[in-house]
Curated annotation (Swiss-Prot):
<protein>
    <recommendedName>
        <fullName>Hydroxyacylglutathione hydrolase</fullName>
        <ecNumber>3.1.2.6</ecNumber>
    </recommendedName>
</protein>
<dbReference type="Pfam" id="PF16123">
    <property type="entry name" value="HAGH_C"/>
</dbReference>
<keyword id="KW-0862">Zinc</keyword>
<feature type="binding site">
    <location>
        <position position="170"/>
    </location>
    <ligand>
        <name>Zn(2+) 2</name>
    </ligand>
</feature>
<dbReference type="InterPro" id="IPR032282">
    <property type="entry name" value="HAGH_C"/>
</dbReference>
<dbReference type="InterPro" id="IPR001279">
    <property type="entry name" value="Metallo-B-lactamas"/>
</dbReference>
<dbReference type="Pfam" id="PF00753">
    <property type="entry name" value="Lactamase_B"/>
</dbReference>
<comment type="subunit">
    <text>Monomer.</text>
</comment>
<feature type="binding site">
    <location>
        <position position="112"/>
    </location>
    <ligand>
        <name>Zn(2+) 1</name>
    </ligand>
</feature>
<dbReference type="InterPro" id="IPR017782">
    <property type="entry name" value="Hydroxyacylglutathione_Hdrlase"/>
</dbReference>
<comment type="similarity">
    <text>Belongs to the metallo-beta-lactamase superfamily. Glyoxalase II family.</text>
</comment>
<comment type="pathway">
    <text>Secondary metabolite metabolism; methylglyoxal degradation; (R)-lactate from methylglyoxal: step 2/2.</text>
</comment>
<dbReference type="InterPro" id="IPR036866">
    <property type="entry name" value="RibonucZ/Hydroxyglut_hydro"/>
</dbReference>
<feature type="binding site">
    <location>
        <position position="132"/>
    </location>
    <ligand>
        <name>Zn(2+) 1</name>
    </ligand>
</feature>
<dbReference type="GO" id="GO:0004416">
    <property type="term" value="F:hydroxyacylglutathione hydrolase activity"/>
</dbReference>
<feature type="binding site">
    <location>
        <position position="60"/>
    </location>
    <ligand>
        <name>Zn(2+) 2</name>
    </ligand>
</feature>
<dbReference type="InterPro" id="IPR050110">
    <property type="entry name" value="Glyoxalase_II_hydrolase"/>
</dbReference>
Length: 258
């Protein structure tokens, strides 16, 4: 049984910590800062960091990799098409890799960056570590990829089982939900989610992980085929957007300035 906890980093990052209590081994996802992981390891001296999983090359996701590799000798896994510090295993789309006894399938999900990958573990309750591609009620900015690429990546993730747990790496949920409400003010599920997320943050609790089912009902970037979302995108752009990709592009540009 793998336990998954969040180690907060910087202002709003989460480093996901996977723990196998039987073997006393652990793994981390996107350690942008080594210090939270080092502190956890110091408080758990009988545990060993065996693996470091990286989704993309941005500093707030890889800044702690080299130090943790030097400290622990952990294996570093990351996208083949990006420059990842101390990488031992370069991963391509469709490959499978075992971490703490869990087999993860690698998805290439370009958009936020061109080489971005996600780690998917199919199970009774599937797990998805998706970096800055799919957020709770949102998606990552397009620093390198195109709207069409990101739309395709998100559609791929949206097609995963509805109960897939979504582990993204930023606490952006409330700001994303505010934008989502601007897109779909009459979405009752969205209003309910906003109220629940507000209660969680008022108690300084995290809003993650999410689930694919929740994203499908409340994330505007996964709802670009819905009439309500298309209508708002058409109003925003002043023209008829004929494809889901065009609707997505309008929403993403709007969110960038929201």
């Amino acid at each position: 049984m793998i336990q998954i906890d969040a180690l907060p980093a910087f202002n709003d990052n989460y480093i996901w910590l996977l723990q196998d209590a039987t073997s006393r081994r652990c793994a981390v996802v996107d350690p942008g800062d080594a210090k939270p992981v080092e502190a956890w390891l110091a408080a758990h001296p009988d545990w060993r960091l065996s693996d470091i999983l990286v989704t993309h090359h941005h500093h707030d996701h890889v800044g702690g990799v080299a130090a943790l590799k030097e400290l622990t000798g952990a294996r570093v896994l990351g996208p083949a098409n990006e420059k990842i510090p101390a990488r031992d295993l370069a991963l391509e789309d469709g490959e499978r890799v075992e971490v703490l006894g869990l087999v993860f399938e690698i998805f290439h999900v370009p958009g936020h960056t061109l080489g971005h990958i996600a780690y998917y573990h199919p199970a009774e309750t599937p797990l998805l570590f998706c970096g800055d591609t799919l957020f709770a009620a949102g998606c990552g900015r397009l620093f390198e990829g195109t709207p069409a690429q990101m739309h395709h990546s998100l559609a791929r993730l949206a097609a995963l089982p509805a109960n897939t747990r979504v582990y993204c790496t930023h606490e952006y949920t409330l700001s994303n939900l505010r934008f989502a409400l601007a897109v779909e003010p009459d979405n009752a599920a969205l209003r309910e989610r906003f109220e629940e997320a507000t209660r969680l943050r008022e108690r300084d609790r995290i809003t993650l992980p999410s689930e694919i089912s929740l994203e499908l009902s409340t994330n505007p970037f996964l709802r670009v085929s819905e009439n309500s979302v298309k209508k708002k995108a058409d109003q925003r752009s002043g023209q008829q957007n004929r494809t889901p990709e065009e609707v997505f592009a309008v929403l993403r540009a709007w969110k960038d300035q929201f």
